[in-house]
A protein has these predicted regions:
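Phosphate/NTP-binding elements of NTP-utilizing enzymes
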Residues: 2-254
Length: 254
């Protein structure tokens, strides 16, 4: 039996409050910092977070809310590799499937989505700036694992927002080395709303689990779980190594 349509008052409330939308329609109860991000009006947000705090989950929800409540919106999701950008896209699709009544879709592929209201989601790899050219006036750009995306690619993203006065960009990552656009924007000035949340902030990750990771590799622990940037000479990571780490078993977020 089809679900009844959502009444206008509730629809307006969900449009105005993405955190309420997450609770009522996605079954996702945001942590306090996630609710703050969802309700933020800032056009530029940067998230320096430890692993498994829920940054991808909340940004996927924000991207879906943008698509639903801004008809004709273009959402661009970019990450160091195509597979990584698809991971956040999969989270968005998972949220989309939670909606009752269902949201009509015009087209869905492994790398993109088009809704009946004209909104689109496009996923792109961040290893080549040429792949991001050709898009304009996005409502939202999401750069996932931004510390590992090429600086030239980030430079190619920014001009897209010139024709989008209400466009937003969200950079999110675990830190890497003290270099590159993610590091510079995190520590620099500019009109960026900043969020820093080490993994210890997440109530779903146990202290015992974190203590074990710290004993295993203190240097990596400080970078991946405590939001600390490493020295450039300590860097041995490649995009392929970062891509492979996403295949590891993760602590459940929900």
């Amino acid at each position: 039996m089809p679900s009844p349509p959502i009444d206008l008052t509730t629809l307006v409330a969900h449009g105005l409050d993405p955190a309420l939308f997450c609770v009522d329609r996605l079954g996702f109860e945001p942590d306090p910092w996630q609710a703050r991000l969802l309700r933020s009006k800032a056009s530029q947000c940067i998230l320096n977070c430890g692993r498994q705090v829920g940054k991808s989950t909340v940004v996927a929800a924000l991207a879906l809310h943008t698509c639903l409540y801004k008809p004709g919106a273009l959402v661009i999701v970019i990450a160091p590799s195509q597979r990584q950008s698809r991971e956040l896209f999969i989270k968005l699709i998972g949220f989309l499937q939670c909606l009752e009544p269902p949201e009509p879709r015009e087209e869905e592929t492994k790398l993109s989505l088009a809704l009946s209201n004209g909104s689109r989601v496009v996923t792109l790899p961040g290893d080549n700036p040429r792949t991001v050219r050709g898009y304009s006036a996005p409502a939202l750009i999401v750069e996932d694992e931004a510390a590992f995306v090429a600086d030239e690619t980030f430079d190619a993203l920014i001009p897209m927002l010139a024709a989008a006065p209400d466009g937003r960009i969200v950079l999110m990552s675990t830190p890497h080395i003290a270099a590159g656009h993610f590091y510079q924007l995190w520590h620099g000035g500019g009109d960026w709303e900043r969020y820093e949340h080490p993994t210890a902030d997440c109530p779903r990750v146990s202290r015992e689990w974190l203590d074990k990771r710290r004993r295993d590799d203190p240097l990596r622990f400080s970078r991946e779980y405590e939001c600390q940037f490493g020295n450039p000479e300590d860097s041995l990571f490649t995009v392929e190594m970062i891509d492979r780490r996403h295949n590891l078993v993760s602590v459940p977020l929900l």
